[in-house]
Regions:
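Structural signature of tandem alpha-helical TPR/SEL1-like repeats
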Residues: 39-48, 79-81, 145-148
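Short, small-residue-biased leader/transition segments that mark boundaries at the very start
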Residues: 3-4
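Short solvent-exposed coil/turn linkers within tandem alpha-helical repeat scaffolds
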Residues: 9-20, 36-40, 51-68, 72-76, ...
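TPR-repeat structural position
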Residues: 43, 94, 99, 143-146
Length: 187
């Protein structure tokens, strides 16, 4: 279907139904996007098509629906990043340092999609991975990495004071402080 819509607005760029054709071409791509575990190139195409529709027709009655589809597609991309970061975390030290890959993947997802509803889950993955990175570090880097884990605990507590992960954060904080020899310090 999307080919028919695309051919219509390419052949009749000023046609009566060009607005609808552009919208439905984007919607067809939206409906055709795969689940987050799979390759997301179709999701990027759908976002691009819907953004082009909104640029060409900023006053369209379909603009809000197109914007909502873009948000849903971005959520799918965030979920893909979250699943990748979680996979790296679960792989741990298998065949290299996957904890660092987890941190980088999750931080990039937070940078690219700052308003995601998975922000808390990505942040706890970063904290867990930084802590595990400290635990399995060589002696020279261990103290620095424990400090990074403590800093991440503070950042997490500030951003998510009512988090469902707070007990785990407190446990990591106490263990990291203990390893740094700062256990008597107040939280």
């Amino acid at each position: 279907r999307r080919v028919l819509f695309r051919s219509y607005y390419n052949v009749y760029p000023r046609g009566t139904f060009t607005e609808l054709a552009r919208f439905h071409a984007g919607k067809a791509l939206y409906l055709d996007t795969p689940e987050p575990r799979l390759d997301q190139s179709g999701t990027y195409s759908a976002i691009q098509q819907l953004q082009m529709f909104m640029e060409y027709f900023p006053q369209s009655s379909k603009k809000e629906e197109a914007q909502n589809m873009i948000f849903a597609l971005q959520d799918k991309l965030v979920m893909k990043e979250y699943l990748s970061a979680k996979l790296y975390y679960n792989m741990g030290n298998y065949l290299g340092n996957n904890y660092q890959a987890c941190v980088i993947t999750a931080q990039n997802a937070l940078k690219d999609y700052p308003y995601t509803n998975l922000r808390e889950d990505l942040s706890i993955l970063i904290l867990r991975a930084k802590y595990e990175l400290a635990v399995y570090s060589v002696e020279d880097k261990r103290a620095e990495r424990y400090r990074e884990a403590v800093d991440e605990c503070y950042a997490f507590k500030n951003e998510f004071p009512e988090s469902k992960y707070m007990k785990e954060v407190d446990r990591i904080f106490k263990e990291a402080q203990k390893m740094l020899g700062e256990g008597s310090e107040e939280q």
